[in-house]
Amino acid sequence: MKCPYCAYGESKVVDSRSTEDGSSIRRRRECLKCNRRYTTYEKIETTPILVIKKNMSREYFDRNKIVNGLMKACQKRPVSRKQIEQIANEVERHISNEMLTEVNTDKIGQIIMKNLKKIDEVSYVRFASVYRQFKDINTFMEEIKNLMDKN
């Protein structure tokens, strides 16, 4: 790895430790030429996951899209950022556990709705209305009736 200060190609590791979440290793390095120190992070390289959209186009999985969609659905509701992050984590965990390289939006939506329903039913209906493309008030009423029947 090249030194960011002098571009010399050799360094020694001064300190190495796992990050808080255990997903990467933080290393303090010292350049063998200029003796300046810098930090690097080592992370496992993962295979990119493709999302198959409803129109059959494909795009790279983007966790931020899930978080942003949930933020909109949970706006002005008693749902914390931490809970939203946990739902996004659950989606990633599910995809990872099944070792999928491609996943359709339907599967992602189902995982989100299953988890969101446990946290806040109003946010769940909001999310479902966009995800399932509710066309009219009757569709909203049917979904609310289903929720009430299950409670």
From Swiss-Prot:
Superkingdom field: Bacteria
NCBIfam families: transcriptional regulator NrdR
UniProt remark on cofactor binding: Binds 1 zinc ion.
S-S bridge residues: none
Name the UniProt record assigns to this protein: Transcriptional repressor NrdR
Transmembrane regions: none
Source organism of this protein record: Clostridium botulinum (strain Hall / ATCC 3502 / NCTC 13319 / Type A)
Family in the record: Belongs to the NrdR family.
